[in-house]
Amino acid sequence: MQQLQNVIETAFERRADITPANVDTVTREAVNQVISLLDSGALRVAEKIDGQWVTHQWLKKAVLLSFRINDNQVIDGGESRYFDKVPMKFADYDEARFQKEGFRVVPPAAVRQGAFIARNTVLMPSYVNIGAYVDEGTMVDTWATVGSCAQIGKNVHLSGGVGIGGVLEPLQANPTIIEDNCFIGARSEVVEGVIVEEGSVISMGVYLGQSTKIYDRETGEVHYGRVPAGSVVVSGNLPSKDGKYSLYCAVIVKKVDAKTRGKVGINELLRTID
Protein backbone atom coordinates (compact mmCIF):
# COMPACT_ATOMS: atom_id res chain seq x y z
CA MET A 1 0.00 0.00 0.00
CA GLN A 2 2.90 2.36 0.71
CA GLN A 3 4.15 1.92 -2.86
CA LEU A 4 0.70 2.80 -4.17
CA GLN A 5 0.61 5.89 -1.97
CA ASN A 6 4.05 6.95 -3.17
CA VAL A 7 2.95 6.79 -6.81
CA ILE A 8 -0.10 8.93 -6.04
CA GLU A 9 1.86 11.49 -4.00
CA THR A 10 4.51 11.84 -6.71
CA ALA A 11 1.97 12.20 -9.50
CA PHE A 12 -0.02 14.76 -7.55
CA GLU A 13 2.99 17.05 -7.29
CA ARG A 14 3.03 17.32 -11.08
CA ARG A 15 -0.73 17.16 -11.59
CA ALA A 16 -0.85 20.40 -13.58
CA ASP A 17 1.18 18.73 -16.33
CA ILE A 18 -0.86 15.52 -16.47
CA THR A 19 -3.45 15.05 -19.22
CA PRO A 20 -5.39 12.02 -20.47
CA ALA A 21 -3.05 11.96 -23.47
CA ASN A 22 0.28 11.97 -21.62
CA VAL A 23 -0.41 10.19 -18.33
CA ASP A 24 2.01 7.31 -17.80
CA THR A 25 0.83 3.74 -17.32
CA VAL A 26 2.05 3.47 -13.72
CA THR A 27 0.10 6.55 -12.64
CA ARG A 28 -3.04 5.56 -14.50
CA GLU A 29 -3.01 2.06 -13.03
CA ALA A 30 -2.38 3.40 -9.52
CA VAL A 31 -5.24 5.89 -9.73
CA ASN A 32 -7.61 3.29 -11.15
CA GLN A 33 -6.62 0.85 -8.41
CA VAL A 34 -7.38 3.41 -5.69
CA ILE A 35 -10.76 4.25 -7.21
CA SER A 36 -11.56 0.53 -7.35
CA LEU A 37 -10.56 0.07 -3.70
CA LEU A 38 -12.69 3.05 -2.67
CA ASP A 39 -15.55 1.67 -4.73
CA SER A 40 -15.38 -1.68 -2.93
CA GLY A 41 -14.97 -0.18 0.54
CA ALA A 42 -11.53 -1.73 1.00
CA LEU A 43 -10.17 1.80 1.46
CA ARG A 44 -11.97 4.86 2.76
CA VAL A 45 -10.98 8.52 2.79
CA ALA A 46 -11.56 8.83 6.53
CA GLU A 47 -11.82 6.29 9.33
CA LYS A 48 -12.04 6.30 13.09
CA ILE A 49 -8.78 5.18 14.70
CA ASP A 50 -8.49 5.02 18.51
CA GLY A 51 -11.61 7.16 18.84
CA GLN A 52 -10.46 9.91 16.47
CA TRP A 53 -11.35 10.50 12.84
CA VAL A 54 -8.29 10.35 10.58
CA THR A 55 -8.36 11.64 6.98
CA HIS A 56 -6.15 9.94 4.41
CA GLN A 57 -5.25 12.88 2.21
CA TRP A 58 -3.49 10.73 -0.38
CA LEU A 59 -6.78 9.06 -1.25
CA LYS A 60 -8.32 12.46 -1.92
CA LYS A 61 -5.33 13.19 -4.15
CA ALA A 62 -6.05 10.01 -6.09
CA VAL A 63 -9.65 11.10 -6.62
CA LEU A 64 -8.50 14.49 -7.88
CA LEU A 65 -5.97 12.83 -10.18
CA SER A 66 -8.74 10.71 -11.67
CA PHE A 67 -10.22 13.89 -13.12
CA ARG A 68 -6.86 14.74 -14.72
CA ILE A 69 -6.31 11.38 -16.42
CA ASN A 70 -9.77 10.78 -17.87
CA ASP A 71 -11.58 12.46 -20.77
CA ASN A 72 -15.31 13.08 -20.71
CA GLN A 73 -17.27 10.27 -22.32
CA VAL A 74 -20.88 9.50 -23.06
CA ILE A 75 -22.38 7.46 -20.22
CA ASP A 76 -25.61 5.52 -20.61
CA GLY A 77 -27.87 6.09 -17.62
CA GLY A 78 -30.98 4.21 -18.64
CA GLU A 79 -33.55 7.02 -18.66
CA SER A 80 -30.91 9.53 -19.73
CA ARG A 81 -27.33 9.89 -20.96
CA TYR A 82 -24.41 11.73 -19.37
CA PHE A 83 -21.10 13.23 -20.46
CA ASP A 84 -18.54 13.05 -17.67
CA LYS A 85 -15.08 11.89 -16.61
CA VAL A 86 -16.35 9.49 -13.92
CA PRO A 87 -18.37 6.37 -14.83
CA MET A 88 -21.53 5.48 -12.95
CA LYS A 89 -21.01 2.86 -10.24
CA PHE A 90 -23.74 0.51 -11.41
CA ALA A 91 -23.01 0.71 -15.15
CA ASP A 92 -22.00 -2.96 -15.40
CA TYR A 93 -24.13 -4.40 -12.57
CA ASP A 94 -26.51 -7.23 -13.37
CA GLU A 95 -29.18 -8.73 -11.13
CA ALA A 96 -26.76 -11.27 -9.64
CA ARG A 97 -24.33 -8.56 -8.54
CA PHE A 98 -27.07 -6.41 -7.03
CA GLN A 99 -28.30 -9.48 -5.12
CA LYS A 100 -24.79 -10.28 -3.92
CA GLU A 101 -24.02 -6.78 -2.66
CA GLY A 102 -27.40 -6.53 -0.97
CA PHE A 103 -28.58 -2.94 -1.33
CA ARG A 104 -31.58 -1.40 -3.08
CA VAL A 105 -31.41 1.40 -5.66
CA VAL A 106 -34.54 3.27 -6.75
CA PRO A 107 -34.45 5.10 -10.10
CA PRO A 108 -33.13 7.63 -10.91
CA ALA A 109 -30.62 7.45 -8.04
CA ALA A 110 -27.09 8.22 -9.24
CA VAL A 111 -23.87 6.92 -7.69
CA ARG A 112 -20.45 7.69 -9.14
CA GLN A 113 -17.76 5.04 -9.37
CA GLY A 114 -15.44 5.29 -6.37
CA ALA A 115 -18.27 5.57 -3.85
CA PHE A 116 -18.93 2.63 -1.53
CA ILE A 117 -22.46 1.45 -0.73
CA ALA A 118 -22.77 -1.17 2.03
CA ARG A 119 -25.32 -3.95 2.48
CA ASN A 120 -28.92 -3.24 3.50
CA THR A 121 -28.67 0.35 2.29
CA VAL A 122 -31.59 1.93 0.44
CA LEU A 123 -30.96 4.66 -2.11
CA MET A 124 -34.11 6.52 -3.05
CA PRO A 125 -33.77 8.96 -6.00
CA SER A 126 -30.62 10.56 -4.63
CA TYR A 127 -26.99 11.32 -5.47
CA VAL A 128 -23.77 9.88 -4.01
CA ASN A 129 -20.49 11.38 -5.19
CA ILE A 130 -17.05 9.82 -5.74
CA GLY A 131 -15.08 8.89 -2.61
CA ALA A 132 -18.14 8.76 -0.36
CA TYR A 133 -18.70 5.86 2.05
CA VAL A 134 -22.25 4.84 3.00
CA ASP A 135 -22.34 2.15 5.67
CA GLU A 136 -24.82 -0.66 6.41
CA GLY A 137 -28.51 -0.14 7.03
CA THR A 138 -28.60 3.49 5.94
CA MET A 139 -31.46 5.19 4.12
CA VAL A 140 -30.57 7.94 1.64
CA ASP A 141 -33.99 9.44 1.00
CA THR A 142 -35.37 11.26 -2.03
CA TRP A 143 -33.25 14.15 -3.40
CA ALA A 144 -30.67 13.76 -0.64
CA THR A 145 -27.06 14.27 -1.74
CA VAL A 146 -23.92 12.71 -0.27
CA GLY A 147 -20.93 14.81 -1.30
CA SER A 148 -17.47 13.71 -2.37
CA CYS A 149 -15.58 11.76 0.32
CA ALA A 150 -18.39 12.18 2.90
CA GLN A 151 -18.56 9.39 5.48
CA ILE A 152 -22.01 8.09 6.46
CA GLY A 153 -22.26 5.60 9.32
CA LYS A 154 -24.42 2.58 10.02
CA ASN A 155 -28.21 2.86 10.39
CA VAL A 156 -28.30 6.53 9.44
CA HIS A 157 -31.40 8.17 7.96
CA LEU A 158 -30.77 11.04 5.56
CA SER A 159 -34.23 12.50 5.03
CA GLY A 160 -35.62 14.05 1.87
CA GLY A 161 -33.52 16.84 0.39
CA VAL A 162 -30.68 16.56 2.91
CA GLY A 163 -27.32 17.86 1.72
CA ILE A 164 -24.12 16.31 3.07
CA GLY A 165 -21.23 18.44 1.86
CA GLY A 166 -18.36 17.14 -0.21
CA VAL A 167 -14.71 18.03 0.23
CA LEU A 168 -11.99 17.44 -2.33
CA GLU A 169 -10.49 20.92 -2.18
CA PRO A 170 -8.94 22.53 -0.27
CA LEU A 171 -6.95 19.35 0.15
CA GLN A 172 -6.31 19.76 3.88
CA ALA A 173 -10.02 19.97 4.67
CA ASN A 174 -11.61 17.01 6.42
CA PRO A 175 -14.72 15.31 5.03
CA THR A 176 -18.19 15.73 6.47
CA ILE A 177 -18.97 12.80 8.78
CA ILE A 178 -22.30 11.44 10.02
CA GLU A 179 -21.64 8.75 12.63
CA ASP A 180 -23.73 5.64 13.34
CA ASN A 181 -27.42 5.77 14.28
CA CYS A 182 -28.01 9.43 13.38
CA PHE A 183 -31.16 10.98 11.94
CA ILE A 184 -30.81 14.03 9.69
CA GLY A 185 -34.12 15.84 9.13
CA ALA A 186 -35.50 16.94 5.78
CA ARG A 187 -33.73 19.77 3.93
CA SER A 188 -30.97 20.04 6.52
CA GLU A 189 -27.42 20.77 5.34
CA VAL A 190 -24.25 19.46 7.00
CA VAL A 191 -21.11 20.76 5.27
CA GLU A 192 -17.48 21.87 5.63
CA GLY A 193 -16.26 18.80 7.50
CA VAL A 194 -18.73 19.03 10.38
CA ILE A 195 -18.95 15.81 12.43
CA VAL A 196 -22.37 14.70 13.69
CA GLU A 197 -21.53 12.24 16.43
CA GLU A 198 -23.24 8.92 17.12
CA GLY A 199 -26.94 8.78 17.95
CA SER A 200 -27.70 12.44 17.25
CA VAL A 201 -31.01 13.69 15.87
CA ILE A 202 -31.00 16.76 13.63
CA SER A 203 -34.39 18.39 13.07
CA MET A 204 -35.75 19.56 9.73
CA GLY A 205 -34.05 22.57 8.14
CA VAL A 206 -30.93 22.79 10.32
CA TYR A 207 -27.79 24.20 8.66
CA LEU A 208 -24.41 23.20 10.05
CA GLY A 209 -21.06 24.54 8.82
CA GLN A 210 -17.75 25.20 10.56
CA SER A 211 -18.83 28.72 11.54
CA THR A 212 -22.28 27.72 12.84
CA LYS A 213 -22.72 28.16 16.58
CA ILE A 214 -24.09 24.95 18.09
CA TYR A 215 -25.54 26.11 21.41
CA ASP A 216 -26.26 23.69 24.26
CA ARG A 217 -29.15 25.28 26.15
CA GLU A 218 -28.60 23.12 29.24
CA THR A 219 -24.94 24.06 29.77
CA GLY A 220 -24.56 27.28 27.80
CA GLU A 221 -21.61 25.77 25.95
CA VAL A 222 -21.07 26.62 22.28
CA HIS A 223 -19.60 24.03 19.90
CA TYR A 224 -18.20 24.59 16.42
CA GLY A 225 -17.83 21.90 13.77
CA ARG A 226 -19.09 19.08 15.99
CA VAL A 227 -22.45 17.89 17.27
CA PRO A 228 -21.82 15.92 20.49
CA ALA A 229 -23.06 12.33 20.62
CA GLY A 230 -26.72 11.87 21.49
CA SER A 231 -27.75 15.47 20.80
CA VAL A 232 -31.20 16.53 19.64
CA VAL A 233 -30.69 19.67 17.55
CA VAL A 234 -33.13 22.26 16.17
CA SER A 235 -32.76 25.62 14.42
CA GLY A 236 -32.55 28.72 16.58
CA ASN A 237 -31.06 32.18 17.04
CA LEU A 238 -28.66 33.81 19.48
CA PRO A 239 -28.72 37.56 20.29
CA SER A 240 -25.79 39.81 19.45
CA LYS A 241 -23.72 41.30 22.26
CA ASP A 242 -25.41 44.68 21.85
CA GLY A 243 -28.86 43.10 21.67
CA LYS A 244 -29.71 44.84 18.39
CA TYR A 245 -29.97 41.75 16.23
CA SER A 246 -29.80 37.98 16.34
CA LEU A 247 -27.94 35.47 14.21
CA TYR A 248 -28.80 31.93 13.18
CA CYS A 249 -27.53 29.07 15.31
CA ALA A 250 -28.30 25.43 15.98
CA VAL A 251 -29.60 24.60 19.45
CA ILE A 252 -29.01 21.35 21.35
CA VAL A 253 -32.32 21.07 23.17
CA LYS A 254 -31.64 17.76 24.92
CA LYS A 255 -29.35 14.75 25.09
CA VAL A 256 -30.54 11.17 24.73
CA ASP A 257 -28.79 7.87 25.29
CA ALA A 258 -29.19 4.76 23.18
CA LYS A 259 -31.72 3.25 25.59
CA THR A 260 -33.99 6.29 25.47
CA ARG A 261 -33.60 6.61 21.72
CA GLY A 262 -34.56 2.96 21.29
CA LYS A 263 -37.77 3.41 23.27
CA VAL A 264 -38.87 6.78 21.90
CA GLY A 265 -39.64 7.57 18.26
CA ILE A 266 -37.72 10.25 16.39
CA ASN A 267 -40.83 12.40 16.02
CA GLU A 268 -41.44 12.35 19.77
CA LEU A 269 -37.85 13.38 20.49
CA LEU A 270 -38.26 16.39 18.21
CA ARG A 271 -41.73 17.41 19.36
CA THR A 272 -41.12 17.35 23.11
CA ILE A 273 -38.34 19.91 23.41
CA ASP A 274 -39.63 22.08 26.26
Curated annotation (Swiss-Prot):
Its EC number is 2.3.1.117. The keyword Acyltransferase applies. Signal peptide: none annotated. The keyword Transferase applies. Pathway: Amino-acid biosynthesis; L-lysine biosynthesis via DAP pathway; LL-2,6-diaminopimelate from (S)-tetrahydrodipicolinate (succinylase route): step 1/3. Transmembrane segments: none annotated. GO terms for molecular function: 2,3,4,5-tetrahydropyridine-2,6-dicarboxylate N-succinyltransferase activity; nucleotidyltransferase activity. SUPFAM superfamilies: Trimeric LpxA-like enzymes. PROSITE patterns: HEXAPEP_TRANSFERASES. GO terms for biological process: diaminopimelate biosynthetic process; lysine biosynthetic process via diaminopimelate. Keywords: Acyltransferase, Amino-acid biosynthesis, Cytoplasm, Diaminopimelate biosynthesis, Lysine biosynthesis, Repeat, Transferase. GO terms for cellular component: cytoplasm. It is found in: Cytoplasm. Its main location: cytoplasm. It holds the Pfam family Hexapep_2. It is an enzyme of class 2 (transferase). It catalyses: (S)-2,3,4,5-tetrahydrodipicolinate + succinyl-CoA + H2O = (S)-2-succinylamino-6-oxoheptanedioate + CoA. Belongs to the transferase hexapeptide repeat family. This is 2,3,4,5-tetrahydropyridine-2,6-dicarboxylate N-succinyltransferase. It comes from Salmonella heidelberg (strain SL476).
